[in-house]
């Protein structure tokens, strides 16, 4: 099964200062009819989450100005329903533990392939859907 099919009904926000990554993912998503919005900085990402709801929020850790962890922390407050993915080129224990503490769903290390990222996103969405269904049954 094509993991892009799992993303067609989901809106994705990508925040990354790397133009190649932004352009590559935007092209990959749009050619598969998967909605994506890209931002170069955390500040642009915050503007995006004020303007629309996202199912998936992906952020690079190293960004100019506010870092990706601080951005995702704010994004989680505004859009707690979103799956949060942190992209990082650095294996840093503090970064990982802080990311888990603030609710980051998954990590992906650079370099990564579009195929690997899309598979991770599809899996994360499925997992979240199952967790919500279990939570809804538990409340009844």
Language-model regions: role of each:
Residues 22, 64, 92:
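The feature encodes the CheY-like receiver
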Residues 60, 88:
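Active-site residues of response regulator receiver
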Residues 1-11, 115-140:
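Non-catalytic signal-transmission and effector/linker regions of two-component phosphorelay proteins
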Residues 47, 69-81:
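Short amphipathic alpha-helix used as the core "switch/output" element in two-component signaling
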Residues 38-56:
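Acidic, metal-coordinating helix/loop segments flanking the phosphotransfer/catalytic sites
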Residues 41, 67-70:
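Acidic catalytic/metal-coordinating carboxylates
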Residues 19-37:
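Two-component/phosphorelay signaling modules centered on CheY-like receiver
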Residues 70, 91-106:
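Alpha4 helix (beta4-alpha4-beta5 surface) of REC/receiver domains from two-component response regulators
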């Amino acid at each position: 099964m094509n993991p892009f099919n799992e993303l067609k009904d989901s809106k994705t926000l990508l925040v990354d200062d790397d133009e190649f990554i932004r352009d590559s993912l935007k092209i990959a998503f749009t050619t598969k009819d998967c909605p994506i919005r890209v931002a170069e900085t955390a500040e642009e990402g915050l503007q995006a989450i004020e303007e629309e709801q996202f199912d998936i929020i992906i952020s690079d850790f190293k960004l100019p100005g506010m870092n990706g962890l601080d951005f995702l922390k704010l994004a989680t407050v505004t859009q707690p329903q979103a799956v949060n993915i942190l992209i990082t080129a650095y294996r840093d224990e503090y970064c990982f533990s802080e990311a888990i503490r603030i609710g980051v769903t998954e990590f992906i290390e650079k370099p990564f392939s579009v195929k690997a990222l899309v598979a991770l996103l599809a899996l994360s969405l499925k997992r979240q859907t199952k967790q919500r269904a279990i939570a809804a049954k538990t409340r009844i």
